């Protein structure tokens, strides 16, 4: 129902307006106050010894940030840099912080997105609610560029480049602040960022167009790869910010989907529930982010669908050149 109020102009929005509007005003006041404390110097933000690139958004929910983080890490690695990624680790609780991931780190400790990023890129990834501490842990590993997965509103960490990801189809919904709308900050905040990347839909003037390109489905147990259209009677589920995006992708690939099930973003799955869900079809298909959470008990007919961010070469060059410019000001040998 929240999604309908935020993005579909549901009539319930007007019924709840007297209750939610004051809360949105309060949310905005608190948000602005927190930022102003760092802007005016009343609170001191941490300045990392290496460039910090934020990949975030101004709306709640998933817009495609993680594929952009993966893309950016891979691009920087190709250029000879040593990027590392910091994250809050939403939905997880580590025994201690900062937590630097390894191949055996359970998602319950680090979160699904950090685990996915580490697995896809091999880059160092650190999780800490205090992102500055995660940055310090990565700097000790000789990382020379920091990328923050989310964290646009985490003003306790200074940043050099800001990339904001926008859902090109849903945009900013009713353009109201949380809880009446999906906005973490007002749309005017976009005037201050370096790049606005639009995921799907039609990019507006000044925005960079991006698409998510799916590849072959990968079996969780055997790593076999097949075209998703070859899998019959699929049960599709997704625990991401906007599950219908995944289901629409499957439809566009002519997948034989019989059942769909959406879960909350970062939800910790119940094994028995997924196993019962799997009985409704011949194969199970999920997102890569979901796969990192249930690989330990995956069955032979469970598959996931990786996606990769695709940008026009000229737009990719603009982003990378901006990061190179910033990197040069730090005077590192790898600049």
Swiss-Prot record:
SUPFAM superfamilies: P-loop containing nucleoside triphosphate hydrolases. Its EC number is 2.7.1.130. It catalyses: a lipid A disaccharide + ATP = a lipid IVA + ADP + H(+). One of its GO terms (molecular function) is tetraacyldisaccharide 4'-kinase activity. It is an enzyme of class 2 (transferase). ATP binds at residues 59-66. One of its GO terms (cellular component) is plasma membrane. Pathway: Glycolipid biosynthesis; lipid IV(A) biosynthesis; lipid IV(A) from (3R)-3-hydroxytetradecanoyl-[acyl-carrier-protein] and UDP-N-acetyl-alpha-D-glucosamine: step 6/6. GO terms for biological process: lipid A biosynthetic process; lipopolysaccharide core region biosynthetic process. Keywords: ATP-binding, Kinase, Lipid A biosynthesis, Lipid biosynthesis, Lipid metabolism, Nucleotide-binding, Transferase. It holds the Pfam family LpxK. Transfers the gamma-phosphate of ATP to the 4'-position of a tetraacyldisaccharide 1-phosphate intermediate (termed DS-1-P) to form tetraacyldisaccharide 1,4'-bis-phosphate (lipid IVA). Belongs to the LpxK family. This is Tetraacyldisaccharide 4'-kinase.
């Amino acid at each position: 129902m929240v999604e309908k109020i935020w993005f579909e102009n549901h009539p319930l929005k007007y019924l709840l307006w007297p209750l939610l509007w004051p809360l949105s005003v309060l949310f905005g006041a608190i948000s602005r106050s927190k930022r102003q404390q760092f802007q005016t110097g009343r609170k001191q933000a941490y300045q990392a010894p290496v460039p910090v690139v934020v990949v975030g958004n101004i709306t709640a929910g998933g817009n495609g940030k993680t594929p952009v983080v993966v893309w950016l890490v891979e691009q920087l690695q190709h250029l000879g840099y040593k990027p590392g990624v910091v994250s809050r680790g939403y939905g997880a609780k580590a025994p201690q912080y900062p937590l630097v991931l390894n191949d055996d780190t359970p998602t319950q400790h680090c979160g699904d997105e950090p685990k996915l990023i580490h697995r896809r890129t091999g880059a160092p990834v650190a999780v800490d609610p205090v992102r500055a501490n995660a940055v310090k842990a990565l700097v000790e590993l000789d990382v020379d560029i920091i990328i923050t997965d989310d964290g646009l509103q985490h003003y306790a960490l200074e940043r050099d480049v800001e990339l904001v990801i926008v859902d090109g189809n849903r945009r900013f919904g009713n353009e109201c602040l949380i809880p009446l709308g999906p906005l973490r900050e007002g749309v005017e905040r976009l005037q201050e960022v370096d790049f606005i990347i639009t995921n799907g839909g039609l990019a507006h003037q000044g925005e960079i167009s991006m698409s998510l390109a799916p590849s072959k489905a990968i079996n969780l147990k055997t790593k076999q790869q097949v075209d998703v259209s070859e899998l019959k009677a699929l049960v599709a589920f997704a625990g991401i910010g906007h599950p219908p995006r995944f289901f629409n992708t499957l439809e566009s690939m002519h997948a034989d989907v019989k059942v769909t099930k959406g879960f909350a973003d970062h939800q910790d799955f119940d094994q028995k529930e997924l196993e019962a869900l799997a009985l409704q079809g011949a194969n199970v298909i999920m997102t890569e982010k979901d796969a990192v959470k249930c690989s330990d008990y995956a069955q032979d007919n469970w598959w996931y669908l990786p996606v990769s961010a695709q940008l026009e070469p000229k737009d990719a060059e603009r982003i990378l050149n901006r990061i190179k410019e910033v990197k040069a000001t730090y005077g590192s040998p790898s600049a």
